[in-house]
Amino acid sequence: RIAVNLRHQFFAAQAAYPQMKAAGGGSIVNFGSISWMNGEGNFNAYTTSKAAVHGMTRGLARDWGVDRIRVNTVVPGWVMTERQIKLWLDADGERQIFENQSLKDKLYPPDIARMVLWLAADDSRMCTAQNFIVDAGWT
């Protein structure tokens, strides 16, 4: 799980750094998960690796801020991807969504994409080292 959930984000950021520095700055957006914030059980490697993404984000933001490189994490809730719907969404899952989320609607990929686009844009120029939670109020 560490290789799947953490390493690629570190190596991608590391590879992008020289070009972003040369360009005078940029934005790196990592992906976390609300699972570690909620203390989900039976997913220890997954939740540990997703918590590590937050630590990595804050460390890189501190190190690279001097080069005007912003580093943030988008933390999605239960997003209704085709895979999620096919493999895990059932009547109990629907009940959990509506019991736990403050906004009583399903979360879809475009909801996450809009946050990523905002973080990539200059509109978020003073945002770095942060977790941006897009979970309809679950956490």
Label the model's feature ranges.
Residues 13, 49, 57:
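Active-site helix of classical SDR
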Residues 18, 62-66, 125:
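Alpha-helical segment proximal to the catalytic Tyr-Lys
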Residues 21-22, 64-66, 79, 120:
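A short hydrophobic alpha-helix cap/turn motif
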Residues 33:
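Residue(s) in the substrate-gating loop at a strand-loop-helix junction
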Residues 39-47, 59:
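Active-site loop-to-helix junction immediately N-terminal to the catalytic Tyr of the SDR YXXXK motif
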Residues 42, 66, 78-101:
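A glycine/serine/threonine-rich, flexible loop-to-helix segment
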Residues 106-134, 139:
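C-terminal substrate-recognition "lid" of short-chain dehydrogenase/reductases
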